[in-house]
Amino acid sequence: MIQRYDHPVQSGCSMRIIGHRGARGEAPENTLGGFQYIQNLGIRAVEFDVRQLKDDALIIMHDDDFVRTSGQQKNLYECSREELDAYNHAVNWSEWNKVEATPLLDQTLSLIQNFEHIEVEVKAVKTQAEAEKITLALEQQLKGFEHSAVITSFDPKIHQALRSRHSQFKRG
């Protein structure tokens, strides 16, 4: 269980606790409720995953479908933002008393605007054109978060797109 931690590890040193996918294992992952949960604990660092829907909306989601988190078989790349409320990511959390829809990136950024560290993992895409499109949209939405956001990806196409645009964001 994650607990509030306000004290340095040793004199002169401190530890940064980063909420992986929000509070994965403690709250429905990659949800506004999960991000609020870590914020309530005093955690001000988070990692989450970003994907782009067919209508170009950027969403927070690790998997490319809704099966594991909502129990519904649907490829997210076939969805538009209007369909997101149909997928409750808290369905497997009997003690969680709130519906957790798939959040848009801009909703998430509004909630975590006071965080010190925001690690945005861009999931793999099929083509360089898709990489260019998602990174352009991502950089536009992350404006104002240059001091706290780091864009990460295991996909070399994403890194190439960021390099070619001379991105000002830290990368990993």
Regions picked out by a protein language model, each given a short descriptive name:
Residues 1-172:
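Phosphate-group recognition and catalysis centered on beta-loop-alpha active-site segments
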